[in-house]
Amino acid sequence: MSIRIELAESMEVLSLRVVGPYYEKIPQGFDEILSWAREHHLSIDKSLAFYWDDPSKVEADELRADVAITCKEMPSTLPEDVGIRREVIPGGLYAVTHTIVENGDFAKAWDDFYKAINAQGYCPAGDICYESYLCDGSNGKWDIEIWQSVEAAN
């Protein structure tokens, strides 16, 4: 797997927290946030999923993720009752890869990505890691970019 190291700018997103098995809760979260965005006539630029827990260390029903979108024009206010928040994702140094995920095997893509980061002389830094979806996966294949904040390994 090839990666690139990129100095990214901060990014404003609208996000919704989901808790539970990633394979189950992330699609449900996207259904909810995308439905909300359509109801509010928002023009979506990107769909992202931020992962806050390592599935090898946290029970599946306690896994936390944020599904998020970026919009051409962000709404000035957000309703308090739907759980959608405005957040700024910090800029900085990130490792990035572009890959195709088949048969729902996102774990393999992440494993390969982390091996490539280490092979390039970097290690994860901070907690920011996410997927940026370049298609809707309706054909069973997910065209994605994976992003991880990094620093040079010592």
From Swiss-Prot:
GO molecular function per UniProt: DNA topoisomerase type II (double strand cut, ATP-hydrolyzing) inhibitor activity
Assembly behavior: Interacts with DNA gyrase.
This protein's encoding gene: sbmC
GO cellular component terms, semicolon-separated: cytoplasm
Record's protein name: DNA gyrase inhibitor
UniProt record similarity statement: Belongs to the DNA gyrase inhibitor family.
Any Pfam family the entry gives: GyrI-like
UniProtKB keywords: Cytoplasm, Stress response
